[in-house]
Regions:
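Multi-pass alpha-helical transporter architecture, strongest
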Residues: 174-205, 210
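Transmembrane alpha-helical cores of Major Facilitator Superfamily
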Residues: 8, 43-47, 74, 102, ...
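Cytoplasmic membrane-interface "Motif A"-like loop-to-helix N-cap segments
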Residues: 61-73
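C-terminal ends and interior cores of transmembrane alpha-helices
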Residues: 75-90
Length: 210
C-alpha cells in the first residue's frame, strides 16, 4: 500500500504538468510564447518522459530503488515549489521554466519505469507480475485525479473571472504537497519480514507445460 501511494503521488504530480503544459507556458509568459512553440514544448516533454525511463531506471541499479525515489520526491518538491517563480511577473525565464518542467517529467517517466524493479527487490521475481498489476491501479487513479485537480482549479478561476495565471501556483503547490506525501510513504517502505517469505517448495516450477 505504501508503494501504491508512492506511485500515485509521482504520477499525479507528473500528469499535473503534462495535462496543461501548452496552456501553462503560454499563460506564464503571455505574449511571448506562440502556440507552435508551446506545441514544441509539449514534444520536448515527451522526449524527456521517454529518456527519463531509461536514465532513472539505469541510475536506480547503482543508487538503489528507494534512494532513487528519495531523489524523485525531494528534488520534485523543490522544483514544483520553484516553477511558479519562473513566470513573467517574477523571474521571467522561459529557459528555466522549460528546464524545470523537463526534469520533473523525466522523473515522472523514471518513476514509472523503476517501480517493477522496486517490487522485485521487495517481493522477489516470482510475485512481481501479480503485484505490479494491482499497483497499476495507482497509475489509473492518478490519471483521473491529476486532471481533476488541474481542471477543477482552472475552471474555478475562469468561472469567477479571476486571473488564470494565478491558478498555476496553487496547482503546482498542491503537486509539491503530493511530493511530500510520496516522500513519507517511500521513507516508510520496509523489506518484507522473513516470516512472510514463501518456502522454496511452495513455488510452482517454471518450464514447458507450466
Amino acid at each position: 500500500y505504501l508503494l501504491w501511494i508512492v506511485l500515485f503521488c509521482n504520477v499525479t504530480a507528473g500528469i499535473g504538468i503534462l495535462e496543461d503544459a501548452s496552456p501553462m507556458i503560454q499563460d506564464f509568459f503571455k505574449g511571448h510564447i506562440l502556440a507552435a512553440a508551446a506545441g514544441g514544448f509539449v514534444g520536448l516533454l515527451s522526449i524527456f518522459n521517454m529518456a527519463g525511463r531509461f536514465f532513472w531506471a539505469s541510475m536506480s541499479d547503482f543508487l538503489g530503488r528507494k534512494a532513487t525515489y528519495f531523489i524523485f520526491f525531494t528534488l520534485g518538491a523543490i522544483l514544483f515549489f520553484t516553477l511558479p517563480l519562473t513566470r513573467g511577473d517574477h523571474l521571467n525565464s522561459v529557459p528555466l521554466f522549460v528546464a524545470i518542467a523537463a526534469v520533473i517529467i523525466s522523473m515522472y517517466g523514471g518513476g514509472f519505469a523503476t517501480i517493477p524493479a522496486y517490487l522485485k527487490d521487495l517481493f522477489g521475481g516470482y510475485n512481481v507480475s501479480a503485484i505490479h498489476g494491482r499497483l497499476l491501479t495507482a497509475w489509473s487513479t492518478a490519471g483521473i485525479v491529476g486532471p481533476l485537480i488541474v481542471n477543477g482549479i482552472l475552471d474555478h478561476y475562469v468561472s469567477n473571472h479571476l486571473n488564470k495565471q494565478d491558478a498555476y501556483p496553487q496547482i503546482l503547490h498542491i503537486m509539491c504537497g503530493l511530493m511530500v506525501v510520496g516522500f513519507v510513504a517511500n521513507l516508510l517502505v520496509r523489506p518484507v519480514a522473513e516470516k512472510h517469505w514463501m518456502a522454496e517448495q511452495n513455488l510452482a516450477p517454471v518450464g514447458p507445460g507450466h
